[in-house]
Regions:
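Short, Lys/Arg-enriched N-terminal segments with co-localized hydrophobic residues
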Residues: 1-4
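Short, charge-rich amphipathic segments
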Residues: 6-19, 42, 61-73, 184-209
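Histidine/acidic residue-rich metal-binding segments in metalloenzymes
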Residues: 17-124, 128-146
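Glycine-rich, acidic/polar active-site loops that bind/position phosphate-bearing ligands
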Residues: 149-210
Length: 210
């Protein structure tokens, strides 16, 4: 068996050396012309969202302010309009489970309208939360195997982006009990803790620092 495994390892290395670099064509001469083209950044938010919604979303991104569900509906509408204009037909909650990779839950923008036709739909409810099957992901022993429910929740601090024909929405992945099942949720908690500690230190020099 050890001899077979050694041969397999050599074959893997040999195959890896045979791979050639993929040629990538530059979309334009100036990076500024295509940088962020497929990212729903603040520029796109300002263009596709009402001013009240834009300001609320920016407040959530910059200051961690909570978002009302009605705001989420309008964000979803603007995000869907931009994505469809860019050629997207599907959307996915994109997260980083404890497998040192990424995972996605794909859905199409189109839904049956109940009258024999189709309609494009993407609501705030679909943007904010999805329910992927968590049974196939590591959980660190925090739950029983049969407790397979997991939730992916939208993270407004990371901008949505398009890959091919899919709108990717960055999310955190948690168990139904609230424990983190991904790498991102602990990082966000750590960032908030560091931010709070830094502000406390800054108050020694300037009480108005927020």
């Amino acid at each position: 068996k050890s001899g077979i495994m050694s041969k397999l390892r050599f074959r893997v290395v040999e195959t890896a050396f045979k791979k050639k670099a993929v040629e990538v064509a530059t979309p334009a001469e100036r990076p500024s012309e295509y940088f962020g083209k497929y990212v729903f950044n603040k520029e796109k938010m300002f263009k596709y969202l009402p001013s009240k919604v834009y300001n609320a979303l920016i407040d959530a991104i910059d200051n961690g302010a909570p978002l009302d569900r009605s705001i989420a509906d309008e964000v979803a509408a603007g995000m869907k309009k931009w994505a469809i204009e860019m050629g997207a037909t599907h959307y996915t909650h994109w997260f980083a489970p404890l497998t040192e990779g990424t995972a996605e839950k794909h859905d199409a923008f189109v839904e049956h309208d109940g009258k024999g036709g189709m309609m494009e739909e993407f609501t705030g409810k679909l943007l904010v939360q999805q329910e992927p099957d968590a049974s196939s992901f590591p959980n660190g022993g925090i739950r029983n195997t049969f407790e397979a429910r997991g939730y992916s929740a939208w993270d407004p601090s990371s901008p949505a982006f398009i890959v091919d024909d899919t709108l990717c929405i960055p999310t955190v992945f948690i168990a139904y009990t609230g424990e983190a099942l991904d790498y991102k949720a602990p990082l966000l908690k750590a960032l908030r803790a560091v931010d709070k500690a830094a502000v406390d230190v800054c108050h020694y020099f300037n009480p108005e620092v927020k």
